[in-house]
């Protein structure tokens, strides 16, 4: 990738992330954010940031969130709350995760088609309905799986078995049902 191509890709990612963050903050400021789910994730990440068990009073008195869904990857978000302990930080994390998922898509497409088509593929991804729906629905842990899955496909395509294995293990920390997604990826790779 040339410097110019890298700058173009970075500009697209920064623009998308900025739009996602702006949309997320506007939803929060106008009381459009889904208080139930956002409240749960805010409490859980806040507890992790304080080195406490991930309890959520939104789910119930002393409700341990890992009893609802298994998503220990949320503990990795604690440092973000050390910087700014606010539910809107989850909107920033979501925007960064979605934008980061475009990098392996670009690398995958560029190897096959060239810079222009790869950049168009990234733009299409960042503007796609699934991404817009995720941004419009506030933070959910599954959003963290998007870049991991994208990098996993890139690693498999490049026959980077150890990296793919590590990414597959990391994907399992996103949510308990990501094993089904890994099964689908394995079936596609076997064909």
Where are these regions (language model features)?
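Transmembrane-helix motifs of polytopic, lipid-linked glycan transferases
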Residues: 88-112
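Extracytosolic helix-loop segments that constitute the early lumenal/periplasmic catalytic or substrate-binding loops
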Residues: 25, 40-64, 72-73
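Start-transfer (signal-anchor) and selected internal transmembrane alpha helices
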Residues: 1-21
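Specific aromatic-rich, kink-prone transmembrane helix
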Residues: 100, 104-107, 124, 143-168, ...
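Helix-to-loop transition at the C-terminal end of transmembrane segments
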Residues: 18-39
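Short helix- or helix-capping micro-motifs
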Residues: 118-129, 168-172
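Juxtamembrane segments of multi-pass membrane glycosylation machinery
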Residues: 50, 69-93
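Short acidic/glycine- and proline-prone juxtamembrane loop motifs at membrane-interface regions
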Residues: 134-142
